[in-house]
């Protein structure tokens, strides 16, 4: 798989990024392990997740799947999405971004 430089960083990432929106909801852990392994075998080293995906289950599952191989992957996550109706559990404030990560 072709790679590209991520912005101005020195990171080289695969041109395709594995999305994990359904991990933790419609994708059980063992299926997620197989999906990630297959992607890696094809040259993918870039995974996308977000705190809002299945209310954090996706990020948790990605962590479980990558345990012991974290150094082989580049992770992209998103913040800002509302995790609840509470005003301090959404948006782009410094405190929320640190808590979300």
Locate the predicted segments by residue.
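N-terminal binding-site loop/beta-alpha segment at the start of enzyme catalytic domains
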Residues: 1-77, 81-83
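Glycine/proline-rich, positively charged
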Residues: 86-101
């Amino acid at each position: 798989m072709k790679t590209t430089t991520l912005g101005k960083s020195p990171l080289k990432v695969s041109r395709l990024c594995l999305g994990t929106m359904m991990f933790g909801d419609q994708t059980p852990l063992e299926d997620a392990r197989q999906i990630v392994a297959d992607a890696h075998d094809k040259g993918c080293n870039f995974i996308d997740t977000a705190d809002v995906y299945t209310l954090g289950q996706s990020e948790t599952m990605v962590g479980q799947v990558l345990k012991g191989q974290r150094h082989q992957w580049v992770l992209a996550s998103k913040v800002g999405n509302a995790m609840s109706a509470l005003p301090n559990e959404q948006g782009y404030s410094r405190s929320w971004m640190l808590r979300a990560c």
